[in-house]
């Protein structure tokens, strides 16, 4: 109590508890909630005032958008009205121009704009990248000041707290991990700490690992360095652990240094750390074998544009598991700005996660995997039915270091084309740009870093599909001068000639062509009936030896135009796309197993519905740096 003249100020220490208790009751009874959060399809009704008071993300989101407004976007690209999602890192909005009229047959994975254009309240938010379990536990904290954590849930809570910028929850998660570390769980804690950059926690967990490692004999240490996945999160940490083992009994163990160092993959260590942390170790400078290993790694880093041609065990990621990646794509919305997200499917968690961000936004582009590098080619950085915003960009992504570099651009701008790798070359075929449909074909030499033209397609094509089989490139369907076609062409790179093959049974474009077990599968897409777009539901299979197409008995689960497509293990995966019959962009993933003749749908949706993305499979590090 304090006095000032005839006035008295009295403090009630129980008020804050009573206020929080009251808010919790309102939340439990779903009273006066004014915003709905959705994570992994599960809805949570909340109060904006509570969210904004605890989360910098929501505070910025709600304050930067008045009660009525257009699309919602945040710095992390998480929040968007459920029925008007916008791509992440959206540029400042400009006055919308009416979309240009699209001629029948124009290759597009998008319908006419009939989406929301009128202002609406921001009261439905899809939190992309947040798990429903993690969000529920974070909301429990916001309304009760208590959070229930376990080693099974702390990673999801930690991820949500960092995405939504709630440092109090992050601090509680870190404290929980630090308190829980034991000899039984230090490996699990170390992995979580590495994923989220928790240096203090990582050091505490590594103490248990080091104590175990120092007691190993030479054979056990050698086996540890060969193990997959590795016991620590980085190659540098593996090197430092090896040095500790050698130094623990230097007189006896130093003879094993060359043998152990051969098992390390020094090219996976960034060049600055090779100089500062590796070269500074005495035996790396004095032992001839170790000197050569270090020199080879430094030479690898000195030639970044040729790294995809210089792959060896020393630069190979320590994993054998390929993962499904989704790159870019066009979300719904009146501004039609493509995504710049690269997402991967976590098969253990059954969810899509954000891996990294492209240097630019792109849709209707191509992605080609070369020695576990991703080459992203062409596409368009803004939707236009006439190819006005097509690009000739070429970028390369390195999952070893989560880094991008720009490569020489294609000689022509292209979107809705096909790209592939054959031996030491990349090929880009057809497509469209501001001049119209393209028949030109370009070839990129992976060793010399140069583009050149090769024999053109017999006809200009866009929105076609392609595949590589037995050293030849097959191109099916597409749009030719506004008409959907069933054509199949085969390119022989040795002879530099194109040959016409048996037509498909169905005209289709914006579809996919995948190779499995010496067969080509044409899946999805659409065609025109009059002026109406119809989903192609039939799945066709082509036998290159017999030059024959057959219609399979199992049609696609639902219409998909412009999905991402990749083959992984024994299945063909289609991600996203547009369904003309449903009038909706898709965020789900369906897969077809030719051996069983069955379709299934994967658990978990991508960050937002997309058409015109690209799919590919790559090997990622065991500790993926997502959501950093």
Curated annotation (Swiss-Prot):
User: By its UniProt entry, which InterPro entries does this protein fall under?
Assistant: BACK, BTB-kelch_protein, BTB/POZ_dom, Kelch-typ_b-propeller, Kelch_1, KLHL14_BACK, KLHL14_BTB_POZ, SKP1/BTB/POZ_sf
Domain BTB positions: 33-151
In which residue ranges is the amino acid composition biased (Low complexity)?
Answer: 84-96
Q: What is its main location?
A: cytoplasm
Keyword Cytoplasm applies: yes
**BACK domain: residues covered:** 210-279
Q: Where in the cell is it found?
A: Cytoplasm, Cytosol; Endoplasmic reticulum membrane
**GO terms for cellular component:** actin cytoskeleton; aggresome; cytosol; endoplasmic reticulum; endoplasmic reticulum membrane; neuron projection; neuronal cell body
Q: Write out the ranges of the annotated region (Disordered).
A: 69-115
Record's keyword terms, sorted: Cytoplasm, Endoplasmic reticulum, Kelch repeat, Membrane, Repeat
Residue ranges of the Kelch repeats are: 323-372, 373-424, 425-471, 473-518, 520-570, 572-620
**Stored Pfam families:** BACK, BTB, Kelch_1, Kelch_KLHDC2_KLHL20_DRC7
Subunit and interaction comment: Interacts with TOR1A, preferentially with the ATP-free form.
Question: Which PANTHER family does the annotation name?
Answer: KELCH-LIKE PROTEIN 14, LD33804P
The protein here is known as Kelch-like protein 14
């Amino acid at each position: 109590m304090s006095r000032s003249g005839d006035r008295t100020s009295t403090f009630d220490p129980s008020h804050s508890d009573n206020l929080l208790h009251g808010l919790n009751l309102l939340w439990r009874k779903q009273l006066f909630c004014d915003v709905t959060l959705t994570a992994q399809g599960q809805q949570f009704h909340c109060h904006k005032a509570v969210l904004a008071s605890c989360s910098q993300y929501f505070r910025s989101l709600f304050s930067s958008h008045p009660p009525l407004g257009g699309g919602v976007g945040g710095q992390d690209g998480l929040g968007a009205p459920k029925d008007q999602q916008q791509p992440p890192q959206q540029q400042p909005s400009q006055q919308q121009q009416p979309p240009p009229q699209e001629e029948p047959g124009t290759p597009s994975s998008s319908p006419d704009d009939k989406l929301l254009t009128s202002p609406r309240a921001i009261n439905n938010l899809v939190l992309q990248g947040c798990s429903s379990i993690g969000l529920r536990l974070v909301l429990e904290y916001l309304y009760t000041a208590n959070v229930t954590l376990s080693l099974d849930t702390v990673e999801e809570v930690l991820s949500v707290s960092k995405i939504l910028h709630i440092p109090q929850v992050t601090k509680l998660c870190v404290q929980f991990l630090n308190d829980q570390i034991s000899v039984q769980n230090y490996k699990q804690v170390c992995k979580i700490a590495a994923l989220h950059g928790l240096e203090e926690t990582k050091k505490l967990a590594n103490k248990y690992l080091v104590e175990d490692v120092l007691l190993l004999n030479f054979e056990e240490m050698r086996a540890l360095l060969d193990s997959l996945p590795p016991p620590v999160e980085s190659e540098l940490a593996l090197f430092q652990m090896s040095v500790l083992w050698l130094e623990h009994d230097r007189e006896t163990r130093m003879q094993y240094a060359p043998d152990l160092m051969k098992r390390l993959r020094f090219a996976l260590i960034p060049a600055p750390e090779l100089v500062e942390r590796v070269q500074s170790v005495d035996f790396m400078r004095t032992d001839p074998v170790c000197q050569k290993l270090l020199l080879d790694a430094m030479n690898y880093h000195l030639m970044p544009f040729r790294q995809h041609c210089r792959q060896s065990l020393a630069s190979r990621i320590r994993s054998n598991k390929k993962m499904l990646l989704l790159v870019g794509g066009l979300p719904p919305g009146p501004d039609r700005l493509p995504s710049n997200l690269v997402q991967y499917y976590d098969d253990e968690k059954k969810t899509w996660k954000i891996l990294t961000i492209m240097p630019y936004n792109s849709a209707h582009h191509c992605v080609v995997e070369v020695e576990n590098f991703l080459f992203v080619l062409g596409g368009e950085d803004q939707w236009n039915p006439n190819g006005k915003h097509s690009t000739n960009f070429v970028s390369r992504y390195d999952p070893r270091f989560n880094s991008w570099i720009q490569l020489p651009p294609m000689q022509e701008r292209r979107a809705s084309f096909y790209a592939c790798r054959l031996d030491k070359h990349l090929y880009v075929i057809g497509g469209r740009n501001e001049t119209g449909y393209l028949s030109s074909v370009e070839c990129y030499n992976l060793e010399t870093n140069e583009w050149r033209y090769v024999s053109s397609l017999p006809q200009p094509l866009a929105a076609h599909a392609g595949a590589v089989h037995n050293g030849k490139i097959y191109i099916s369907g597409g749009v030719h001068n506004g008409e959907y076609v069933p054509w199949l062409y085969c390119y022989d790179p040795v002879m530099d000639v194109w040959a016409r093959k048996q037509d498909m049974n169905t005209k289709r474009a914006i579809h996919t062509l995948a190779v499995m077990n010496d067969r080509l599968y044409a899946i999805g897409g659409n065609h025109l009936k009059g002026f109406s777009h119809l989903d192609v539901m039939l799945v066709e299979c082509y036998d290159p030896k017999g030059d024959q197409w057959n219609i399979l008995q199992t049609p696609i689960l639902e219409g998909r135009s412009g999905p991402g497509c990749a083959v992984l293990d024994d299945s063909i995966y289609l991600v996203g796309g547009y369904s003309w019959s449903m009038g909706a962009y898709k965020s789900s993933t369906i897969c077809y197993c030719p051996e069983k003749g069955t379709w299934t749908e994967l658990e978990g949706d991508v960050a937002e519905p997309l058409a015109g993305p690209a799919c590919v499979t790559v090997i990622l590090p065991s500790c993926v740096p997502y959501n950093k």
